[in-house]
Swiss-Prot record:
Catalytic activity: (S)-malate + NAD(+) = oxaloacetate + NADH + H(+)
Pfam family, one: Ldh_1_N
UniProt keyword Phosphoprotein present: yes
MF GO annotations: L-malate dehydrogenase (NAD+) activity
Organism lineage string: Bacteria, Bacillati, Bacillota, Bacilli, Bacillales
Record protein name field: Malate dehydrogenase
Length: 312
């Protein structure tokens, strides 16, 4: 008898993609297809087999395969895109955007062909622009093309707050709005420790330092690694979003969503609070922002639009 499980395809078998695949399997959320380019098919198969051989030890029942053939991804419930190139020495930001946009379009055509009903979650940077590129190429409803950055940025924000207060991260809630970059907007006013507003627990100058560290969080890890970038926390963030979709949890999470007038912006993807469930983005939640918060979000939107200008 064939066991019918949910199916998730992870495009890109690098550190983030492989870690995402393994976490999905460990949590028994779905059978997993790990995909990379033909030149990397054997290493991709090797990683998938290695994960599968961990299943008796870890005690999970989920099938994992590695492939370069998108036919193997057919009828995926969710497709996660982590593929793309990192910025190399001498490469301009515009070159990076143009190159990764071309990669996104090629991947998206294969996804749309084999899994026309899938929900797509994009991680590839610059993620706000790449999610927009995928949306335009796929022709899917906007609710089914989502970007991941807010869960990660908020996780970093919560981590730093928990460290500052010497509390469990489980008791820290917060939200980060805007683009995934130096102009992101951690919302201190909507952040709490055990239901207590942060502003009553942490001095203003320390909060400002935490906000700034959150904005530079990815760069801090890049600097420490010396080569490469973060992948454990990004993968965990992707899995949290994927689980909310597969289980129709209707969770309030920050996600990169297509805006059509919300927050006063249109025709762009931006990090905002959403209800995430079985249909993808079930609803965009509009928070009331103070003047300085709206100004900060305006700056973030301007940064995102500047990147989008070089999309191909």
């Amino acid at each position: 008898m064939t066991i019918k499980r949910k199916k998730v395809s992870v495009i890109g078998a690098g550190f983030t993609g492989a870690t995402t695949a393994f976490l999905l399997a460990q949590k028994e959320l779905a059978d997993v297809v790990l995909v990379d380019i033909p030149q990397l098919e054997n290493p991709t198969k090797g990683k998938a087999l290695d994960m599968l051989e961990a299943s008796p030890v870890q005690g999970f029942d989920a099938n994992i395969i590695g492939t370069s053939d998108y036919a193997d991804t057919a009828d995926s419930d969710v497709v996660v895109i982590t593929a793309g190139i990192a910025r190399k020495p001498g490469m301009s930001r515009d070159d990076l955007v143009a190159t990764n946009s071309k990669i996104m379009k090629s991947i998206t055509r294969d996804i749309a062909k084999h899994s026309p009903n899938a929900i797509i979650v994009v991680l590839t940077n610059p993620v706000d622009a790449m999610t927009y590129s995928v949306f335009k190429e796929a022709g899917f409803p906007k609710e089914r093309v989502i970007g991941q950055s807010g869960v990660l940025d908020t996780a970093r924000f919560r981590t730093f707050i928990a460290q500052e207060l010497n509390l469990s991260v489980k008791d820290i809630t917060g939200f980060v709005l805007g683009g995934h970059g130096d102009d992101m907007v951690p919302l201190v006013r909507y952040s709490y420790a055990g239901g207590i507003p942060l502003e009553t627990l942490i001095p203003k100058e320390r909060l400002e330092a935490i906000v700034e560290r959150t904005r530079k969080g990815g760069g801090e890890i890049v600097g420490l690694l010396g080569n490469g970038s973060a992948y454990y926390a990004p993968a965990a963030s992707l899995v949290e979003m994927t689980e909310a979709i597969l289980k129709d949890q209707r969770r309030i999470l920050p996600a990169i969503a297509y805006l059509e007038g919300e927050y006063g912006y249109s025709d762009l993807y931006l990090g905002v609070p959403v209800i995430l469930g079985g249909n993808g983005i079930e609803k965009i939640i509009e928070l009331e922002l103070l003047a300085d918060e709206k100004e900060a979000l305006d700056r973030s939107v301007e940064s995102v639009r500047n990147v989008m200008k070089v999309l191909v």
